[in-house]
Structure formats: structure tokens, C-alpha cells
Amino acid sequence: MAGIGRLSTKGSVLLLCDMQEKFRPTIFQFTNVVSNAARLLQACRILNIPQILTEQYPKGLGPTVPELGAEGLKPHTKTSFSMMTESVQSSLKSMGDPQQVILCGIEAQACIACTAYDLLERGMEVHIVADAVSSRSQTDRLFALSRLRQSGVFLNTTEGVLLQLVQDAKHPNFKEIQKLLAHPSPDTGLLAFFSSL
């Protein structure tokens, strides 16, 4: 499974990392990144893929932004950069230890990177949704994505992930997913990244 990185609805989980109020004015393309993450969350709900939400020190950084649409998800609070806290690990265990992780949120060079490294060290397959991940600095964001790719992470886009998950226009949920793709994902400034690919 770790060979080519083909996503499946079975054995996958969506990790939503730290999309909180205090980050709103400082994160590059925050609104568009959250919009893409919200689409991923909606799709995973439709496809019955479990979701885990974290908040970094919410007392200081505030709650998850409402436009993510994460009502009903109880956030796992943390101070570590990695999402892989004891409570998150316990949740993953209760979900049957999914082996494919769809990862989005902020910041790319900090919590996203540390989470991805922890997951990779556990032998899990990590799919980072590049247009649903950002940082305060575009430089940090792009270098983090490049570095994570070197470590074996699969990079994709929101639309790419959703289409991989359904795989066929005959999928029973395809029309619902198609509605989420009616408008192209907003630009999050990733074109510069492709000069290094």
C-alpha cells in the first residue's frame, strides 16, 4: 500500500490540525486553506471516513474557526507540535488503527511536519493535502512540503484526494462529492512549488 499511495475509503482517517482563530490574520492564504479543508471534512463525512481534530493551546490561540464546519468533532487539545498525543493515538486505536492518513491544517513546518514524521515512523502512509496546508511564511510552507516529500509523504490537492477516494462515477456517493467539486479549489499560491518538482 505504501508503494504508490493509492487512497482508499477503507482504512483511512482525516486529521485536521489546529485551524484556530488566532492564526486567522497571520497564516498565508488562511481563508482558502480552511475552505479546502472544509471540503475535505464534508467529503469524509459523506464517505464515512473518520476524522480527528486538534487544537494547539486553545486558551491562547482560540477555538477552531467556525467555517471549517467541524461542529460535532471534539477537539483534542495539545501543546506538542505533533498531533500524535495519547488521546489521538487512543482515538486511532478505537478506529481500528487506520493505515492511511489524510493530513491538513497548519503550520506546515511545525505541527504538520512533526505529525507526518511521527506517522511515518509508525509505518503509516501519509497524504498531505497541499492546498489545505499553510504557514505564516510561504517560504516555510514550500520548503516544508519539499522536505516532507523527501521523507516519503504523498502530496496531493483537495480535488485529487476526493476523486481518488471515489475512483468511479458509479460510486454511490459520487454525485454528492461532485457537488463539492462544482467550483475549482481556490488558489493558495502553490504554483511556485512546481518549479522545484
From Swiss-Prot:
* Superkingdom in the source lineage: Eukaryota
GO cellular component terms, alphabetically, are: cytoplasm
InterPro entries found in the cross-reference section: Isochorismatase-like_dom (IPR000868), Isochorismatase-like_sf (IPR036380), Isochorismatase_domain (IPR050993)
* Family statement drawn from the similarity comment of this UniProt entry: Belongs to the isochorismatase family.
Q: What is this protein called?
A: Isochorismatase domain-containing protein 2
